[in-house]
Amino acid sequence: MPAKLNSPSRYHGIYNAPHRAFLRSVGLTDEEIGKPLVAIATAWSEAGPCNFHALALARVAKEGTKEAGLSPLAFPTMVVNDNIGMGSEGMRYSLVSRDLIADMVEAQFNAHAFDGLVGIGGCDKTTPGILMAMARLNVPSIYIYGGSAEPGYFMGKRLTIEDVHEAIGAYLAKRITENELYEIEKRAHPTLGTCSGLFTANTMGSMSEALGMALPGSASPTATSSRRVMYVKETGKALGSLIENGIKSREILTFEAFENAITTLMAMGGSTNAVLHLLAIAYEAGVKLTLDDFNRISKRTPYIASMKPGGDYVMADLDEVGGVPVVLKKLLDAGLLHGDVLTVTGKTMKQNLEQYKYPNVPHSHIVRDVKNPIKPRGGIVILKGSLAPEGAVIKVAATNVVKFEGKAKVYNSEDDAFKGVQSGEVSEGEVVIIRYEGPKGAPGMPEMLRVTAAIMGAGLNNVALVTDGRFSGATRGPMVGHVAPEAMVGGPIAIVEDGDTIVIDVESERLDLKLSEEEIRNRLKRWSPPSPRYKSGLLAKYASLVSQASMGAVTRPA
């Protein structure tokens, strides 16, 4: 059954003549005003390569929708470029931007009575922000990822942006020269597009396919590929079928679809940020998803894709062997996916994967068989315990450490921790604690890549890190994030002291502060929250509305 259209009540009939007058002013004809009016929401910005080309992609998407008999109008959303904000106040706006993007798309869509939605994203928060809006609106919707950059090269080594961050630590430790750092900087990100490894942007692009909200194979072509343009146009055309058949986003974004996405995340060893984002998208879709679902699926799902930072390959490599569908098909054949879920093609996941054209090339060096995994368990594990009663996240795909016990080195901000690593305060065997960097505390739950890269770059291979902040998808090593409750609301991480023993136990799924329950209670009684860092403006508003990381750090009405 065709979807019920919003636009006729706004643009048809005598009383809507003023509205039509404005549509004529932007070039629409009587015939075009009579067609379904669809939105092209594009996350476009010139402040970084990830979304620089998104406006051009929007024009291509418009062509596709016109071929499908629709009338498209495009609008931009905001973009916060994570890499440019890294290690600065700018990173506090990153996660905030996810929810702002969702709000912006909702406002534009409803204010102008659109009938369907094409979303175009790139950098880390744009994909989840747009998918959250699609889930919230529950209208015919389809997503297309803008694509990753091609990898860089220096002295025979393939580079990603991760290498630049770690090169700073290597330079400070006098392991490389300033000129070598400069050459790495110049060569690491040679084209438009998102970071080339399976960091957060490529992880979420992959999730759009796994959820069934994007065309099969559309996540992996680079931003510079002609196939990227083809997929964008086909995405626009596909929206016509969704409207014609009345398929809305929540018919696709079911609990089973989220299980498929989590399974894919675990198999690919994707970014820990996807845990936050899938929880948030599920919240907007009215689907009850919890951290326990992630661990349940992680236990049964092997890690099979050798993708940076945990492995050896980048998104362009995965594209050459068939893209995300190669991973999905292996999981489906092993009985690990729900093949009967509906997707934006109007077909089931199983039908899509059976009809997909896989290149006839070897792929086992990148994507292994389920029976011969890189690791028997999925790439992300949820930890709980006396230090994180509501949960914390570790990316086991990017570390071989399964148990770590060490003395705490406590910092109350990322900046203090970075200075501490720089000055040699951190010693092998210690656990760096960075607190008051959670959703409410920072606010905005910034990523700690500057610190983790400094640790790795300095050659501190036996140091762990625990934080109520986040990590970049480029982070590797024994790093635990998303600790909940966060320090700002009185979580146990707030009362850790230098020299306390911290235990990270992946096999037992535990994160513990080695103190008696009585001592923890007594310290919490003595604790009082610090003054908020922001008392006005966007970040202050956000801090008053945001939930804990264990709930996806979504903003909710006060």
UniProtKB/Swiss-Prot annotation:
EC number(s) reported in the record: 4.2.1.9
Active site residues according to the UniProt entry: 472 (proton acceptor)
Cofactor dependence: [2Fe-2S] cluster; Mg(2+)
Binding note for cofactor: Binds 1 [2Fe-2S] cluster per subunit. This cluster acts as a Lewis acid cofactor.
Pfam families assigned: ILV_EDD_C (PF24877), ILVD_EDD_N (PF00920)
Catalyzed chemical reaction(s): (2R)-2,3-dihydroxy-3-methylbutanoate = 3-methyl-2-oxobutanoate + H2O; (2R,3R)-2,3-dihydroxy-3-methylpentanoate = (S)-3-methyl-2-oxopentanoate + H2O
Residues where Mg(2+) binds: 82, 124-125, 447
Keyword annotations of the record: 2Fe-2S, Amino-acid biosynthesis, Branched-chain amino acid biosynthesis, Iron, Iron-sulfur, Lyase, Magnesium, Metal-binding
Pathway participation: Amino-acid biosynthesis; L-isoleucine biosynthesis; L-isoleucine from 2-oxobutanoate: step 3/4; Amino-acid biosynthesis; L-valine biosynthesis; L-valine from pyruvate: step 3/4
GO molecular function: 2 iron, 2 sulfur cluster binding; dihydroxy-acid dehydratase activity; magnesium ion binding
GO annotation terms (biological process): isoleucine biosynthetic process; L-valine biosynthetic process
Highest taxon of the lineage: Archaea
Positions of modified residues (N6-carboxylysine): 125
Binding site for [2Fe-2S] cluster: 50, 123, 195
Annotated family: Belongs to the IlvD/Edd family.
HAMAP family from the UniProt entry: IlvD
Listed PANTHER family: DIHYDROXY-ACID DEHYDRATASE DAD (PTHR21000), DIHYDROXY-ACID DEHYDRATASE, MITOCHONDRIAL (PTHR21000:SF5)
Role description: Functions in the biosynthesis of branched-chain amino acids. Catalyzes the dehydration of (2R,3R)-2,3-dihydroxy-3-methylpentanoate (2,3-dihydroxy-3-methylvalerate) into 2-oxo-3-methylpentanoate (2-oxo-3-methylvalerate) and of (2R)-2,3-dihydroxy-3-methylbutanoate (2,3-dihydroxyisovalerate) into 2-oxo-3-methylbutanoate (2-oxoisovalerate), the penultimate precursor to L-isoleucine and L-valine, respectively.
Subunit structure: Homodimer.
Descriptive protein name: Dihydroxy-acid dehydratase
Native species: Saccharolobus islandicus (strain L.S.2.15 / Lassen #1) (Sulfolobus islandicus)
